[in-house]
Amino acid sequence: MLRLDAELNKDTISKLKKPLGKLYPHFEDAIEEIKSSEFLISVGDATFNNLTKYELYPDIGIIDNLIQRKNHNHEVIKAENILKAKNPAGTITDDLWETIGQAMKLSGDGNCHVIEVDGEEDLAVLPCILMASDETTILYGQPNEGLVLLKVCDAKDYAQNLIDTFIKE
């Protein structure tokens, strides 16, 4: 599997500002589709909070304890395992890749596995797309716009193309 310490270039940043899947302005509008997901990954604290508010727990949740760069501590995390990864802003580190892989190996047991990122989790969507099965649904927040729901089968090629544009350290 592809592993790299990489950072964004300006062209990739502009591409990532567009939703990679279907944008729902209101979380509630996506609930039925979320419930029908075979395997669910959430990226971001607000997305994780919204899921747990409705007592929906992803197979894998990736958080950094920040919502729009403000500290946020989750009062209750119902998770079988809490894994840790270091990932500075604007990068995808080997540590993040490996921790996502570890969470995927642990998942599928009906429990929620959380990756707590020291740094920033935003770009974790890309390795999740590349490492997850085609049946996986990934949720993440699009700042000030809503929730993005993407089906991995529809995004693998695009995610690989984005990863290919990263600058290797």
From Swiss-Prot:
GTP binds at residues 45, 64, 121. One of its GO terms (biological process) is coenzyme A biosynthetic process. Keywords: Coenzyme A biosynthesis, GTP-binding, Kinase, Nucleotide-binding, Transferase. The keyword Membrane does not apply. The keyword Transcription regulation does not apply. One of its GO terms (molecular function) is GTP binding. Its EC number is 2.7.1.237. Pathway: Cofactor biosynthesis; coenzyme A biosynthesis. Coiled coil: none annotated. Catalyzes the GTP-dependent phosphorylation of the 3'-hydroxyl group of dephosphocoenzyme A to form coenzyme A (CoA). Belongs to the GTP-dependent DPCK family. PANTHER family: GTP-DEPENDENT DEPHOSPHO-COA KINASE, UPF0218 PROTEIN TK1697. This is GTP-dependent dephospho-CoA kinase. The lineage of its organism: Archaea, Methanobacteriati, Methanobacteriota, Methanomada group, Methanobacteria.
